From Swiss-Prot:
Annotated family: Belongs to the glutamate-gated ion channel (TC 1.A.10.1) family.
Species per Swiss-Prot/TrEMBL record: Drosophila grimshawi
Name assigned to this protein: Glutamate [NMDA] receptor subunit 1
Segments on the Extracellular side according to the record's topology features: 23-568, 668-826
Subunit and partners: Forms a heteromeric NMDA channel with Nmdar2.
Residues spanning the membrane: 569-589, 647-667, 827-847
Biased composition (Polar residues): 972-982
Amino acid sequence: MRVAFIYRWLLCGAAIVNVLVAQRHTASDNPSTYNIGGVLSNSDSEEHFRTTIAHLNFDQQYVPRKVTYYDKTIRMDKNPIKTVFNVCDKLIEKRVYAVVVSHEQTSGDLSPAAVSYTSGFYSIPVIGISSRDAAFSDKNIHVSFLRTVPPYYHQADVWLEMLSHFLYTKVIIIHSSDTDGRAILGRFQTTSQTYYDDVDVRATVELIVEFEPKLESFTEHLIDMKTAQSRVYLMYASTEDAQVIFRDAGEYNMTGEGHVWIVTEQALHANNTPDGVLGLQLEHAHSDKGHIRDSVYVLASAIKEMISNETIAEAPKDCGDSAVNWESGKRLFQYLKSRNITGETGQVAFDDNGDRIYAGYDVINIREHQKQHVVGKFSYDSPRGKMRMRINDSEIIWGGKQKRKPEGIMIPTHLKLLTIEEKPFVYVRRMGDDEFRCEPDERPCPLFNASGATANEFCCRGYCIDLLIELSKRINFTYDLALSPDGQFGHYILRNNSGAMTLRKEWTGLIGELVNERADMIVAPLTINPERAEYIEFSKPFKYQGITILEKKPSRSSTLVSFLQPFSNTLWILVMVSVHVVALVLYLLDRFSPFGRFKLSHSDSNEEKALNLSSAVWFAWGVLLNSGIGEGTPRSFSARVLGMVWAGFAMIIVASYTANLAAFLVLERPKTKLSGINDARLRNTMENLTCATVKGSSVDMYFRRQVELSNMYRTMESNNYVTAEQAIQDVKKGKLMAFIWDSSRLEYEASKDCELVTAGELFGRSGYGIGLQKGSPWTDAVTLAILEFHESGFMEKLDKQWIFHGHVQQNCELFEKTPNTLGLKNMAGVFILVGVGIAGGVGLIIIEVIYKKHQVKKQKRLDIARHAADKWRGTIEKRKTIRASLAMQRQYNVGLMATHAPGTISLAVDKRRYPRLGQRLGPERAWPGDGADVLRIRRPYDLGKGGLTASQLGLGKTRPQQNPLPPRYSPGYTSDVSHLVV
């Protein structure tokens, strides 16, 4: 560890020694004396230059040890050629490292240019202290020139600050067609692009007036200026040209009240400058001594830093050597441009062109008798590190000797207005061929095509038209009203026309017409949002609103089976199953219960039959449907207990069904399907749910900038409509489930059609405002008028008249509050059920009749067969009887003959052959009215015995016999029956 520590210290020591050796070597390689050249305009400047360098050598802050500066000066010659020779012979041959140059303002700029050309050829830096022409900013020509004074065109920066201070938004620029005039215009346009990113009020150039120097008349340009809207004039002109411009402007009364002139330094010195003109004056502009000192110290500061960083080669010595390329001079020029010191003329710094920045200006106000009065300053603010404008507005005397700041713009009284069809705010009606004017409550609103020709004549009326009529009366303006050319409110399109890295927004529709100054005002339901407010002005909202959702009310759908809705399908199935299960259990309980059958007291009759299955099913259905039960009731106690429980179950089921049926068929339908924008079905849109808005509208922009709605917007983007009217029609038809749009329009549609309803609460709250151009003079007047309309109740009157439709809304509410009654549509299923029952009964009776006919035919065939068989059997028996009788007769005859005694023939019943013949009284089948148990018929021989009647014998009702067949008899002899003696 100790060895490593010592090794590190040795490395650090070696590095420090190397740095010190390098610095000593560099310092020893650099020159110790530096000659500074001066091309000055007078002896005082030359003397001050020498004195400044002498004092510099004793200032250790700027001069390193063993370094000495020497001055080499020459007098500026008006002849540029002589100046070139003097520079070569008296400065470059003396090895000057830089040149400070000044000249008289009246001598022109040719001599300083000659010094710049000559020195620049050898890369010798030149510091100008009085040259302010724009040409010196061109580094392709003046490669090594920089200056401690700003060029004239830098006054454009001060213009922007003044416009921002006075809140002027529209200007006219007047400039000469020379290099400086075009430079100040370019500077203004370029700087304004970045300057207005930090301020709220943006100034635009309405008109650019370019004139040739050495004017004789400016009248032609003044005519164009007078028709413009702006009354703020920014002028760059020479003193001579400014005199001509002021002379002609005075003749056209364009220098008096309401006109604002802001001019540069040269124009400020015209001998006819009007009262109220504002101009700029560079601080220390004529202080050559201050600029000489600042230039010398800037040079010393750059050389000192350069000495500490690199080796400086000696300056060139011979002008005749064209091959000299002094790289140290180029490097020294870069060091000079990076200087930033506090000098006698203020903060001294340079831009990339070597031009002075942070130069201070006085704001001059011209008063009576051409007196100049300082009313403000544009100076460097050290704490903030930038320039700051300070103007005392109360000290300014404006044109026409006014103390109040002019509006800076001519307020036109005839405006071009645009609107768009959007019910109920604007109704549009095409004029008929035989119509020449609109109705009293309408206003003409033609539709212009791209070429500007009238395509169609329309009439407009509605909420916004009534507002426009009242507004024009209140603030006193006339107007021409037209419809939006493309029928859209407008949205922006990102374009890159010039190939720049940044995209530019281009607006379409109504907004595009306003941005491109093809219209003065938009009177329509125009939603105020940040995207639009960046490019146009808005009045205070004339109606506050938000975004909501329009949908169709759920219909009172009544299907044929609507009477089954009180119970679910599962419950209906369970009820059906329960009926038959209970019937089966009743049958089993009554069948197997020992008490399920009973006997009559003191009776020897047979037992009654138990409850059969069909009777049990009939009983279960009868109890459930609350129908009378005439027969087939349970006999056993256990079955009757179950029957009572089943009756209670049936009562609960029927009561529940009745209550729920009323709820389903009579109660109000739900008003909406959606709960609002936070409904999960909207946030996670399903295939069977469609929602949409209007393409490029303010609602569309709202969804774009809301991150939490991005998923929903991606889904609905493909469904968006071109117009709101199309979307509303699709909602009515059921093609679109939810239309998201401005609440005012949707509330109007819902009040007009009772089948439509708005869902949920408002979101994205904003307002409708009147759109105007940026900086429009009508903005404040329109805003104040709208506020007065709100206070007076005029806006509320328009709401009731056009949006809410009081009578229609009342009818809808009455319709909603009316108790719902059941109609055929609701109970059609019940009637169909009855019809099915009737049809089923008819079908069953037909089946029964057909079956009975078939049975009767079959029974007849059986009876005929039985009768034939009986007849045949009787015939056979008769033949047998006859044969037997004949045989007996023969035997009898034989016996008689044998015994000669009388004989008899027996006709008694043959009991052995027909043992049950005496019991037949008819078929043993029950007759209607018989008891539940049919008793067997007793023998008729018991009747009359001992005085017993049929009812006492237990016969009950006796069946009358029809044509009873006589018993068959066979002849024969018997000992216990009567016989017939023949």
